[in-house]
UniProtKB/Swiss-Prot annotation:
Gene Ontology biological process: ammonium transmembrane transport
Originating species: Xenopus tropicalis (Western clawed frog)
Residues on Cytoplasmic side: 1-3, 77-80, 140-145, 195-213, 267-271, 317-337, 412-467
Taxonomic lineage of the native organism: Eukaryota, Metazoa, Chordata, Craniata, Vertebrata
Gene responsible for this protein: rhcg
Main localisation: membrane
Any Pfam family hit: Ammonium_transp
Protein name as catalogued: Ammonium transporter Rh type C
Sites carrying sugar chains: 42
Length: 467
């Protein structure tokens, strides 16, 4: 790694500098000519600059990508550094490449890519799909493999997004299809290609401890709190953005209760499992993404969250072991249960909600604005839109599976320096760890134990820690 990682980071960052220098420029709202643009567009105040509408949402989304996803993956007892820092690395590189790729497809004008605050949000969305895929292979790949995967996945994401939004003309405000379905099935396919048959027999480091689960819960709470911003960040100003935040809020709240209920039901002693609370409580935000700005209604959002809490929790209990034991698909973070299945549900909910849209509910102008029934799409009806939404879900699924297969085969090449089975899920391979005087800690623990009453019984977790 001493040679591979520095070379990849230096060369790719130099490439980003060159490409940004050639192609990337500020858009009208970030350019010094903003005052002239204001006059041309009859804009009377600087407060109407898109920055003031989008930046609060951008802040929330940015925190989700770097803090939320990063800390959510710190549950592994010996891979905390890698979880947070490698997520940081892939996201920092990914947003640069995403600005270029998405810019070439969406904001390329007169030979230049014009970027503003919405470009930053969309780049974060793109990187979000990579963070999701990273969860499936967490602890089993090298940093160089992570960078290579990011390069290819961002490219495929941009192509898939362009097909859905520009060719099929679908709505996907919160990215149930473009972000979650694509990212999850891409990551799962890569994990399947990179399967390690002897991993369970040769490595016992995959697992959590009390403190690592607590750190992971920090990521959960950041994601849960900011998900309404995630799903509404790029919606139209006004009622659509407002509605997206409300629908997400309701779905997330319902999801928590059903997750807790099912977690207790499936446990033989009726106890709760932290892996369910860390992950399944977020499934409602995933599933409401596509239909977030549609007239899903508050009670409809509660129903979506209710269903996803059940599906995701049962997935962690039954699907994950099945995938690992029968299909040789080892999913470290359980993204199949948090992103893949809820993403499919979200795509279906979006298709049905779009197909059921009427002028009586949206008004004639509202219906045209919601689904952009204008220009080449002026003759499209809600039922047709529902069909295209379903087609978009299939395209995202296909891109994830086929793209994941190709990229997985590339990552399987020995030139990337992947870790051995024995070194998986262990920070020591890639990080200088702080030295600890184990004898001093054990001595202090033993001294504490000798002063306890003879009939004192230590809690189970403490006994395990002392052992």
């Amino acid at each position: 790694m001493r040679l591979r990682l520095p070379v990849v980071c230096f060369l790719w960052e130099i490439a980003m500098i060159v490409l940004f220098g050639i192609f990337v420029r500020y858009n009208d709202e970030a350019d010094p000519h903003w005052s002239e643009f204001m006059k041309a567009q009859n804009i009377t105040s600087d407060i109407q600059n898109d920055y003031y509408f989008r930046y609060p949402s951008f802040q929330d989304v940015h925190v989700m990508i770097f803090v939320g996803f990063g800390f959510l993956m710190t549950f592994l007892k010996r891979y905390g550094f890698g979880s947070v820092a490698f997520n940081f690395l892939l996201a920092a590189f990914g947003i640069q490449w995403a600005i270029l790729m998405q810019g070439w497809f969406h904001t390329f004008k007169n030979g230049k890519i014009l970027i503003g605050v919405e470009s930053l949000i969309n780049a974060d969305f793109c990187v979000g799909s990579v963070c999701i895929a990273f969860g499936a292979i967490l602890g089993k790949v090298s940093p160089v493999q992570i960078m290579v995967m990011t390069l290819f996945q961002v490219t495929l994401f941009a192509v898939n997004e362009w097909i859905l939004l520009n060719l099929l003309h679908v709505n996907d405000a919160g990215g149930s299809m473009t972000i979650h379905t694509f990212g999850a099935y891409f990551g799962l396919t890569v994990a399947w290609i990179l399967n390690r048959p002897r991993l369970k027999q040769t490595n016992d480091k995959e697992g959590s401890v009390y403190v690592s689960d607590l750190f992971s819960m920090i990521g959960t709470l950041f994601l849960w709190m900011f998900w309404p911003s995630f799903n509404s960040a790029v919606s139209y100003h006004g009622d659509a953005q407002h509605r997206a935040a409300i629908n997400t809020y309701c779905s997330l709240a319902a999801c928590v209760l059903t997750t807790v209920a099912i977690s207790s039901v499936v446990n033989k002693k009726g106890k709760l499992e932290m892996v369910h609370i860390q992950n399944a409580t977020l499934a409602g935000g995933v599933a409401v993404g596509t239909a977030a700005e549609m007239m899903l209604t508050p009670y409809g959002s509660l129903i979506v969250g209710f269903i996803c809490g059940i599906v995701s929790t049962l997935g962690f209990t039954y699907c994950s072991p099945f995938l690992s034991n029968k299909l040789r698909l080892h999913d470290t973070c359980g993204i199949h249960n948090l992103h893949a299945m809820p993403g499919l549900i979200g795509g279906i909910v979006g298709a049905v909600t779009a197909a059921c849209a009427t002028e009586a509910v949206y008004t004639a102008d509202g219906l045209k604005k919601m689904f952009r029934f204008e220009g080449d799409y002026a003759t499209r009806t809600p039922s047709m839109q529902g069909g295209y939404q379903a087609a978009g879900l299939c395209v995202s699924l296909a891109f994830g599976l086929v793209g994941g297969t190709v990229v997985g085969c590339i990552l399987k090449l020995p030139i990337w320096g992947d870790p051995s089975d024995e070194n998986c899920f262990d920070d020591e391979v890639y990080w200088e760890l702080p030295e600890e005087d184990e004898e001093e800690h054990l001595g202090a623990a033993n001294q504490y134990v000798t002063h306890l009453p003879e009939n004192f019984k230590l809690p189970d977790r403490t006994e395990v820690a002392f052992k």
